[in-house]
Amino acid sequence: MTSSSPAGAPYDPDAQVHLGVFYTGVGPQLIWTDPDAPPHVAIETFVHVARLLERGLFDAFFLGEGLRVRENRGRVYDLDVAGRPDAITQLSALAAVTDRIGLVATQNTTYNFPADLARRLASLDLLSGGRAGWNIVTTDNAWTGANFRHGGWLPHERRYERATQFVEAAKELWASWEPDAIAGSGEATSWARPGAIRDVERDTGLVRLRARATVPASAQGRPVLFQAGDSSGGRELAARHADVVFSANTEYDKAVAYAADLRARLAGHGRSPDSLRILPGAAVILGDTPEEARERAEWVHEEQISPPRAIAFLEQYWGTDLSAYDPHGPLPGIEPSETELDPSRGTIPIERRTGKLALIAQWREQAAAENLSILQLVRRVTPRQRSFVGTPSQVADEWVRYVRTRAVDGFNITPHQVPSSLEDIVDKLVPELQERGAYRTEYTGTTLREHLDLPAPISL
C-alpha cells in the first residue's frame, strides 16, 4: 500500500503512532482453522493477547460485539467462530490482569438503555483505573431486533438520532458526580456530600429517563468514546461526541480526505482538531523480504476464503442452497432465487435483483474466459482485507508518513492469526517505529485518555 504525500501537506515531525487491536472474535479475517490457534472464546486467549499488547505498549485492546449470531440457510453460520462472550464482561476480567492497556467495548445504542449501559461502562472505567472506552454502534436490522422486546422498532434513518440522544444522556450521567462528591473519613456524617450527585432527567423523543448515576468518575473522568460509522450521520455523531474514530479509510488519499472532512465538522461543533483521534482499521502482513510478505499475503487471502466459504459466498447471491456444488467445479448453471437466504431481508427488491443478475452474468463471463472454478473465482472477486504488506522497515516508513502528514493518528489492527501475527508486530514492527522516534518506549500515563494524548472531557 503505497502513494506519495500531497504537495503542501501538513507535516508534524514529532507525531506519534497510536495503536489498537480490534479483536472481533468472529468474521472471515480470523484464520481460526490454523492448527496453532488457541480457543477464540477462552479467557486464557484474551489474557494472553492483552498482556502481549501491553508488552508492545499499545493504546487499547478493542473488542467487537454482536447481538445476533450470523446465519446461512436458516442455520448458524459455523464457518467462522460463531459466538463470543459479552465484551464488558471480558474486559472486566482483563482489567484485573493488566495494568495499562486500554479496554474498549463495542456497545449498541439501538437496543441498550442509557442508564444501564452508562453504569456498566463507568464500572469498568472505575475498576480499571480509567482505562475503559466505548465503541458506539447502531443497528437497523430488524432480525437482530427480534432478539429484543423492541424488535424492528426504529427506522433506519433514525438510528443516529437515537444514538446522539443516547450518548448525550450517558455523558450527562457520567458528569453528574462532582469530583469531590465522596466525603472524606473522619467527621463525615454521610458517605457522599449532600447535593454532590445530581439527578438526570431527559425526554428527548427517543431517549427518556429519570436516573441517578451510582458510580463515581474514574481517573480519566469518563470512558473514552469511539465511533465507527462512515455515513454522514456517523461522521456527524463522531464530530459532536467521539474522542476516537475507527474508520475504514486506509488508502492514503482517502484517509487524507476523510480526516479533512472530520476536522471541518469538528470546527462546526466548536471542537479543536486535536480533540479527536483517527484510527483506521487495517491488517498487517510482515515478511523478512518484500517477496516473502507478498507470498504470505496471498496465503492469508486463500486461507480466509476456504472452499466451504466460497460456496456460502455464492449462496448469498443465488439465494438458494448450493451445498451440492463442488467448489472446485464450475459456477452453478441455475438462475438466482427471488428471495434472500437471510430471513430478515425477505424478497429481493427489483433493483437489488437486477444488480445481482448483472453481477452473476459478469462472473460467469469471467469464469468462462479464465477457466475458473467456484473457489478460484470467489478468491478473485472477493475484496482483500485492507493490509499493509512488507518488511517491518517498509511498513514502519508507511505508518510514519501517514501519521506525520496527519492523514491518520494511528491504526486499529485486525489480526488474521492470533497470537502469531500480533507477536510479529510487537517484536518486529514496534522496534522499527521506536527507532524512528514515532512510538513510545514506555507508558507515560495510566489512563486510556493519557495514552491517546486526549484532553480532559469538557463536561468535567
Predicted regions and their residues:
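C-terminal helical cap(s) of enzyme catalytic domains, especially alpha/beta-barrels
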Residues: F148-G151, P155, F166-K171, V256-A264, ...
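Short, conserved secondary-structure transition motifs
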Residues: I278-E292, R449-L460
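Substrate-recognition/cap regions that form aromatic- and gly/pro-loop-enriched pockets
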Residues: E351-P431
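N-terminal beta1-alpha1-beta2 module of alpha/beta enzyme domains
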Residues: T2-V97, Q220-P223, T446, I458-L460
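Internal, glycine-rich beta/alpha segment that forms the wall or movable "lid"
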Residues: P6, Y11-V17, F113-E236, R240-H241, ...
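Conserved, mostly hydrophobic/aromatic
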Residues: L19, L53, L57, L94, ...
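Hydrophobic faces of well-ordered beta-strands that scaffold small-molecule active sites
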Residues: V17-V21, F61-L63, I101-Q107, G130-I136, ...
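Active-site mouth loops of central-metabolism enzymes
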Residues: Q29-E44, T106-A115, G151-W153, E157, ...
